[in-house]
């Protein structure tokens, strides 16, 4: 029996043989995390643990002075993350690393950004089309040393002056050289630069705007079921099961996707039905 609340009047059962049930009760098999598809959203730090992340829109340290989204982990499409792995490897050979200021920005965050600053000079109007950040394949980045110290660049993040574009003739030589190095490495690894912002790069592979995946600040939940819930590779009841979470066991919810929640459980990432989980109080 699984995926059913404790107070449900009808409990669905998952067919198992007696031998299988006995094996699962006594032996915990080794489980290998499946490799995500390129279009799947993943937590970037899982795949690039030494990358530096400073999500400006998760705080008030941005041009609006307000918090735009309430999660503090960087999320991107897995295909984009694979390219960032190559970027980070190249930079590490130079004693540098990437520092990321913004990644996936849900459409809800784009609407909030527009509400705060309804000026198309500064913010993409979501009523006319979403920012590429809402596709999960775009990053705002800079160069830094491993200790977090940022290199000199033409401007700071979200500077709206002419100095922010990719005409580096109007900034000092050191800043220009650093910006050109960042641009070259990103392009070599499969990103295209935006001419108006030296920090803005988009994966050359396009993805659709993502309307259902909604990251949250990681929150502790437990399995609210009679026996167990299934941890699946994708947000679908037809997806493969990679683990079973016993009733009462706890895990971290990282994001919501329609009727599913993306969770982290026992060093695995997968999806469970939201109807059968409850927050730990």
Say what each PLM segment does.
Residues 235-240:
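Short alpha-helix capping/helix-loop boundary micro-motifs
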Residues 144, 234, 264-266:
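A generic structural motif
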Residues 248, 261-265:
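SH3/SH3-like beta-barrel fold
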């Amino acid at each position: 029996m699984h995926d059913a609340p404790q107070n449900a009047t009808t409990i669905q059962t998952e067919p198992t043989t007696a031998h299988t049930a006995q094996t699962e009760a006594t032996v915990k098999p080794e489980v290998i995390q499946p490799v995500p598809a390129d279009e799947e959203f993943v937590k970037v730090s899982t795949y690039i643990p030494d990358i530096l992340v400073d999500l400006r829109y998760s705080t008030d340290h941005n041009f609006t002075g307000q918090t735009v989204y309430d999660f503090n982990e960087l999320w991107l499409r897995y295909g984009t993350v694979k390219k960032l792995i190559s970027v980070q490897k190249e930079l590490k050979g130079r004693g540098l690393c990437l520092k990321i200021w913004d990644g996936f920005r849900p459409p809800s965050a784009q609407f909030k950004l527009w509400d705060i600053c309804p000026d198309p000079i500064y913010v993409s109007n979501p009523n006319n089309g979403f920012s590429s950040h809402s596709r999960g394949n775009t990053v705002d980045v800079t160069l830094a040393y491993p200790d977090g110290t940022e290199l000199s660049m033409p401007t700071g993040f979200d500077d709206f002056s002419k100095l922010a574009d990719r005409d580096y003739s109007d900034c000092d030589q050191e800043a220009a050289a650093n910006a050109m190095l960042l641009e070259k490495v990103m392009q070599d690894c499969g990103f295209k630069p935006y001419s108006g912002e030296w920090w803005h790069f988009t994966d050359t592979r396009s993805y659709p705007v993502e309307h259902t995946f909604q990251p949250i600040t990681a929150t502790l939940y437990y399995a609210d079921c009679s026996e167990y819930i299934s941890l699946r590779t994708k947000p679908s009841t037809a997806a493969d099961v990679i683990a079973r979470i016993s009733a009462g066991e706890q895990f971290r919810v990282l994001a919501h996707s329609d009727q599913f929640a993306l969770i982290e459980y026992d060093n695995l990432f997968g999806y469970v039905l939201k109807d059968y989980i409850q927050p730990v109080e």
